[in-house]
Amino acid sequence: MQVVVVKHFVNTSLMVIAFYIDEMNFRGVANSTFLYSKYNEVVLKNKSLIFYNKSNANNKNVVIKKFKKKFKTIGVNNFSAIEQYLYKYKIKYIYTQKGGKKDTWVSNKIKTLVHYVYPQKLSEIHGYKYVCVSSWLGSQFTNNKIPILPYILELKKTHKNLRKKLKIKKNQIVIGCHGGESSFDLKFAQDTLKNLVRKKTNITFVFLNINKFCKHRRIIFLKGTSNETFKRLFLNTCDAMIYGRSLGESFGMACGEFASLNKLIISYKYNRHRSHIDYLSKTRYIEYYSKKSLFNILNNFNKNDKLLSNKKNNYLLCQPKAVMQIFKKVFLNDKSHVKISIVDYFVNYAGFIKMNYYYVRHKIYNQYYKFFESKFS
């Protein structure tokens, strides 16, 4: 039997909620779980206990240290090992964020709160509570039968930026992107940027935590970070966001961060996951669908054009206090059985058909670009 060695944990009469993270990285799952854990204590006055998969080779030590600085944080080899700590810490619930399919991340001894982030068939419902991450998922795939808990959107307060540090002139247009390492994977979008900087000298692209796809002094790649102040400096540096992820977003935290600062989102038209579009007014984003359309958008971009701040931006509703009241409502009340009707199954099926339409449109152009257009451009 495994010997469990843990640091002192203050005895408390507060309700203890455990949070499980399979990969400690710079991406949305880890970032959002940190904020839920933080405000579970600050707003809901509960106790947060962190578990993570210590066997995951992709863990970032700096992220683990960030959690350990704030919470009692314990590494385990698998999800079921958390049950060893049930009585020691009087765990009431275990929260886990995942794709949404039935798997081994569910406990028979601890009430498991499943927060899912990808479209799923309704037959995948499991756990003590099953909650989706966005109104797009809830409406398009569950007919609003599954409760919704959005991410918390929180930005550090500063007016400073990175232009001086990165040696970017004040009059330069700066278009930025941040997210997971593979979040800018559209080859034709990459090629468009490379072509544009050769022809247009007053534009610079800055990528945070994105895999490097070229070498040019005005296409800058910054290492990923868990430092929220640095992220805000990066956001302040940019005049707009360039989005180039083929899959799209089931919530779109990075898009929300840019939009919350009233910056235009330049997005791909044929993403399968389209929550980032659902949250915003059409005046807050512009979509490209080809190399030519993206080139024209970027070439004609005017940094002095201001967005109307009164236009729809539902990301602004994702403030800590408001989100944690939803967390309490959907996760911490008595279990309520979700009744699924034939209409709900039809809506779910229709959602997948629509998503596949976007996928087919995406594949058609990208194959055309790969085998024909890229050869002559």
Where are the regions a protein language model picked out?
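Conserved donor-binding/catalytic core segment of Leloir-type glycosyltransferases
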Residues: 18, 157, 168-184
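N-terminal strand-loop element at the rim of the active site
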Residues: 21-27, 34-82, 211
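Nucleotide-activated donor-binding/catalytic signature segment of Leloir-type glycosyltransferases, i.e.
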Residues: 71, 207-229, 237
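Donor nucleotide-sugar binding/catalytic pocket of nucleotide-sugar-dependent glycosyltransferases
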Residues: 128-158
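Short alpha-helical segment that forms part of, or immediately flanks, the ligand-binding pocket
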Residues: 232, 255-260, 274
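Short hydrophobic beta-strand element within catalytic cores of glycosyltransferases
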Residues: 264-269
